[in-house]
From Swiss-Prot:
Keywords: Chylomicron, Endosome, Extracellular matrix, Glycoprotein, HDL, Heparin-binding, Lipid transport, Lipid-binding, Oxidation, Phosphoprotein, Repeat, Secreted, Signal, Transport, VLDL. This is Apolipoprotein E. It is found in: Secreted; Secreted, Extracellular space; Secreted, Extracellular space, Extracellular matrix; Extracellular vesicle. One of its GO terms (molecular function) is phosphatidylcholine-sterol O-acyltransferase activator activity. Homotetramer. May interact with ABCA1; functionally associated with ABCA1 in the biogenesis of HDLs. May interact with APP/A4 amyloid-beta peptide; the interaction is extremely stable in vitro but its physiological significance is unclear. May interact with MAPT. May interact with MAP2. In the cerebrospinal fluid, interacts with secreted SORL1. Interacts with PMEL; this allows the loading of PMEL luminal fragment on ILVs to induce fibril nucleation. Sequence repeats lie at residues 79-100, 101-122, 123-144, 145-166, 167-188, 189-210, 211-232, 233-254. It comes from Capra hircus aegagrus. APOE is an apolipoprotein, a protein associating with lipid particles, that mainly functions in lipoprotein-mediated lipid transport between organs via the plasma and interstitial fluids. APOE is a core component of plasma lipoproteins and is involved in their production, conversion and clearance. Apolipoproteins are amphipathic molecules that interact both with lipids of the lipoprotein particle core and the aqueous environment of the plasma. Its main location: secreted. Residues 1-18 form the signal peptide. APOE exists as multiple glycosylated and sialylated glycoforms within cells and in plasma. The extent of glycosylation and sialylation are tissue and context specific. Glycated in plasma VLDL.
Length: 316
């Protein structure tokens, strides 16, 4: 689930950044891309594809940039975040209801740990959405400048943006690691507390107490397994929806690429036709001017040859 979220967010970043670098010049080279191997994490591979996409977007025209400059990506991310948080909240409430037979102290501790994990997950996703909006706002502010100034600033901004993306990805990786460790630690503490409370009943040596503890523990294990399977199914459902949306966005980007290529071909054909038209206009004019100049030179040379070379003699 965590790796899927990272891949989703980085791919969405690529969609948001597509409206940034339409008219970049070639004054300064982009930072070198780090090598990506088959053993790298999925989110690292997606981040590499993002940088490849940024390089491709440099060739887009202003019109295509304006078409891509909208809030659809952030809205899609917001809807997916809200759906996921609803699923997590529903599961937490159901789990708290199932924990009612437990001791009050154990129930309060488990509920508190579940709420903390939910809050951390919501905070991480909200932070990612805020970063997307921040990147988009910065680029919108830069697009109001002149073309030459925008070219100069965007070359430097790309390098800084790559560093920020790498830093954000590393920060998200650390947050997910902390969240996973915290969830594992909380679950281990809960199981340990339940085990400690059940151990005195088992150690009493009375057959009736052992039977009762076994009968009480088995339904709890069955319900825990049912919860695990239900949560696994919900997470798979969320993952499928996220993958479908990624596929849809990838298809839209392919359509934009095809549209850009088609427009580029039309522009080239129009430029060639205009060049041929200019040539047909100016070539006769240049030829006529050359002929007139040659005639003028010839007349001047003839006039020079016909002029007298000595003064007339005086009459005595």
């Amino acid at each position: 689930m965590k790796v899927l979220w990272v891949a989703l967010v980085v791919a969405l970043l690529a969609g948001c950044q597509a409206d940034m670098e339409g008219e970049l010049g070639s004054e300064e080279p982009l930072p070198p891309e780090q090598p990506r191997g088959q053993d790298s994490q999925p989110w690292e591979q997606v981040l590499g594809r993002l940088w490849d996409y940024l390089r491709w977007v440099q060739t887009l025209s202003d019109q295509v940039q304006e078409e891509l400059l909208n809030t659809q990506v952030i809205q899609e991310l917001t809807v997916l975040m809200e759906e996921t948080m609803k699923e997590v909240k529903a599961y937490r409430e159901e789990l708290e209801g199932q924990l009612a037979p437990m001791a009050q102290e154990t129930q309060a501790r488990v509920s508190k740990e579940l709420q903390a994990a939910q809050a951390r997950l919501g905070s991480d996703m909200e932070d990612l959405r805020n970063r997307l909006a921040q990147y988009r706002s910065e680029v919108q502010a830069m697009l109001g400048q002149s073309t030459e100034e925008l070219r100069a600033r965007m070359a430097s901004h790309l390098r800084k943006l790559r560093k920020r993306l790498l830093r954000d990805a590393d920060d998200l990786k650390k947050r997910l690691a902390v969240y996973q460790a915290g969830a594992s630690e909380g679950a281990e503490r809960s199981v340990s507390a339940i085990r400690e409370r059940l151990r005195p009943l088992v150690e009493q040596g009375q057959s009736r107490a052992a039977t009762l503890s076994t009968q009480a523990a088995q339904p709890l294990l069955d319900r825990a397994e049912a919860w695990r399977q239900k949560l696994h199914g919900r997470l798979e459902e969320v993952g499928v929806r996220a993958q479908d949306r990624l596929d849809k966005m990838r298809q839209q980007l392919e359509e934009v690429r095809a549209k850009v290529e088609e427009q580029g071909s039309q522009i080239r054909l129009q430029a060639e036709a205009f060049q041929a038209r200019l040539r047909s206009w100016f070539e006769p004019l240049v030829g006529d001017m050359q002929r007139q100049w040659a005639g003028l030179v010839e007349k001047v040379q003839l006039a020079l040859h016909l002029s007298p070379t000595s003064p007339p003699s005086e009459n005595h």
